[in-house]
Amino acid sequence: MAMRLSSAAVALALLLAATALEDVARGQDTERIEGSAGDVLEDDPVGRLKVYVYELPTKYNKKMVAKDSRCLSHMFAAEIFMHRFLLSSAIRTLNPEEADWFYTPVYTTCDLTPWGHPLPFKSPRIMRSAIQFISSHWPYWNRTDGADHFFVVPHDFGACFHYQEEKAIERGILPLLRRATLVQTFGQKDHVCLKEGSITIPPYAPPQKMKTHLVPPETPRSIFVYFRGLFYDTANDPEGGYYARGARASVWENFKNNPLFDISTDHPPTYYEDMQRSIFCLCPLGWAPWSPRLVEAVVFGCIPVIIADDIVLPFADAIPWDEIGVFVAEDDVPKLDTILTSIPMDVILRKQRLLANPSMKQAMLFPQPAQPGDAFHQILNGLGRKLPHPKSVYLDPGQKVLNWTQGPVGDLKPW
């Protein structure tokens, strides 16, 4: 149930809704992104690159899904749907000699707890095993030590394969992946788990499920600030302060009684509808800086309020996050109400028009079947922009750069 707003907030919300309806009537409810970002967002990768998909034993992919179909619906599912997309994509080549990129379809987030949370502890062994397989059955990995290969690693901290930042930093990126291009949800500047050249993508959010919860476009946005989720993680952070670097706790302590803020740990069945009735949707960091809220906010036209210092956002060369979102430093959370109420109305309305652009929403989704401009195509565009590979990535016969014995002893055990 949405909280009751102050008279000032109600007046602002009604004025925003009225102005938005006038824009619809004038055909001005959406706005195309200007400049190169808009062109990049609408690029077509077909004809720009060719990808060879390795045929691995099904134990690395399909059997995992058959064992636990929950993998298909959690926020890490992009690795599964990317594989399915590539198998029927026009950029796929069956001739590895003409490939620009090589893709290894290994699912590293399908080992789930009874509660549906991925356990990343076997992931390094699964990945090493898959790389050993392709390097012994094809010559292409050995030709570059993986520099013309890409992997989808949608864990909390990417190829560091741990859900807690301290442990992820301690592990670092799996040594065998240090020359490959990583396609990952995790993105934070100057972080050991984000290597140079990685492609940052949105987490998976179920497109069909969201589509069934759409409300009429003329529905007024009568909620000023909206958030549903944890503020404290007492199970993993019993003393508090470490989870979300204290930012979520600060949101709760400062604004739990503020009528402008509809915030709660409850997750109502009207969650998606409520986002469509909201002007601002909080997207604070959790254990990692990203979450599906970012996707949901964009799809539902709710201005994302990004509280995650140094975050690297999905497809940042195509999506103008500064123009569609609001960035609030973690230390500035206590001033969140002042920051948001100080944004001029014309700025809010422009952000809403940009968010209403269908190409913006499409870029954040992994639909089945794929559609032009979706997240699959944005990934391919990112790979295409890296071509041609520099000659320096190709090794002399017998030359090795990677150390196969590097890393924690547990990671070296056969899988």
UniProtKB/Swiss-Prot annotation:
Q: What is its EC number?
A: 2.4.-.-
Where does the protein end up? Golgi apparatus membrane
Main subcellular location: Golgi
* Residue intervals passing through the bilayer: 5-25
Q: Which GO terms describe its cellular component?
A: Golgi membrane
Q: What class of enzyme is it?
A: transferase
Give yes or no: UniProt keyword Transmembrane. yes
What topology does the record note for this protein and the membrane? Single-pass type II membrane protein
Q: Which protein, by its recorded name, is this? A: Probable glucuronosyltransferase Os01g0926600
